[in-house]
UniProtKB/Swiss-Prot annotation:
<feature type="disulfide bond">
    <location>
        <begin position="59"/>
        <end position="111"/>
    </location>
</feature>
<comment type="similarity">
    <text>Belongs to the phospholipase A2 family. Group II subfamily. K49 sub-subfamily.</text>
</comment>
<dbReference type="GO" id="GO:0016042">
    <property type="term" value="P:lipid catabolic process"/>
</dbReference>
<feature type="site" description="Important residue of the cationic membrane-docking site (MDoS)">
    <location>
        <position position="121"/>
    </location>
</feature>
<feature type="site" description="Hydrophobic membrane-disruption site (MDiS)">
    <location>
        <position position="127"/>
    </location>
</feature>
<dbReference type="GO" id="GO:0047498">
    <property type="term" value="F:calcium-dependent phospholipase A2 activity"/>
</dbReference>
<dbReference type="GO" id="GO:0005509">
    <property type="term" value="F:calcium ion binding"/>
</dbReference>
<feature type="disulfide bond">
    <location>
        <begin position="42"/>
        <end position="131"/>
    </location>
</feature>
<feature type="signal peptide">
    <location>
        <begin position="1"/>
        <end position="16"/>
    </location>
</feature>
<keyword id="KW-0959">Myotoxin</keyword>
<feature type="site" description="Cationic membrane-docking site (MDoS)">
    <location>
        <position position="128"/>
    </location>
</feature>
<dbReference type="GO" id="GO:0050482">
    <property type="term" value="P:arachidonate secretion"/>
</dbReference>
<dbReference type="GO" id="GO:0090729">
    <property type="term" value="F:toxin activity"/>
</dbReference>
<dbReference type="InterPro" id="IPR001211">
    <property type="entry name" value="PLipase_A2"/>
</dbReference>
<keyword id="KW-1203">Blood coagulation cascade inhibiting toxin</keyword>
<feature type="site" description="Cationic membrane-docking site (MDoS)">
    <location>
        <position position="133"/>
    </location>
</feature>
<feature type="site" description="Important residue of the cationic membrane-docking site (MDoS)">
    <location>
        <position position="124"/>
    </location>
</feature>
């Protein structure tokens, strides 16, 4: 059962370089990224963009929009470099496309931190059955 859970988390946590994104989320929020955000709301995890349930879910919606704009990089395969300086994420590296991906992940981690006060534990495991499509554009 534990192996199944670990595999599910690896598949569901948001797209991109999971190690780097997970570190950013933990650094900004102090929360375990997989268990706190992997299945949160209607937009965190796999699937298309849906009507956000709250501000935290909107962070995931905006992250998917940010990834949609990326060019010449694969958020699933590619990785980037960043550092944690004076409690701030600093995207690095010479590749502008990877830096752009890093900025998407940075924005999501900061968004999660800025919305910790509205984080709803009841929404952290949402199977997306009652999520509605949205006409909201990126």
């Amino acid at each position: 059962m534990r192996t199944l859970w670990i595999m599910a988390v690896l598949l569901v946590v948001v797209e991109g370089s999971l190690v780097q994104l997970g570190k950013m989320i933990f650094q900004e929020t102090g929360k375990n990224p997989a268990t706190s955000y992997g299945l949160y709301g209607c937009n965190c995890g796999p699937g298309g963009r849906r009507k956000p349930k709250d501000a935290t879910d909107r962070c995931c919606f905006l992250h998917k929009c940010c990834y949609k704009k990326l060019t010449d990089c694969d958020p699933i395969k590619d990785s980037y470099s960043y550092s944690w300086v004076n409690k701030a994420i600093v995207c690095g590296g010479d590749d502008p496309h990877l830096k752009e991906m890093c900025e998407c992940d940075k924005a999501m981690a900061i968004c999660f931190r800025e919305n910790l006060d509205t984080y709803d534990k009841k929404k952290k495991i949402n199977l997306k059955l009652f999520c509605k499509k949205t006409s909201e554009q990126c």
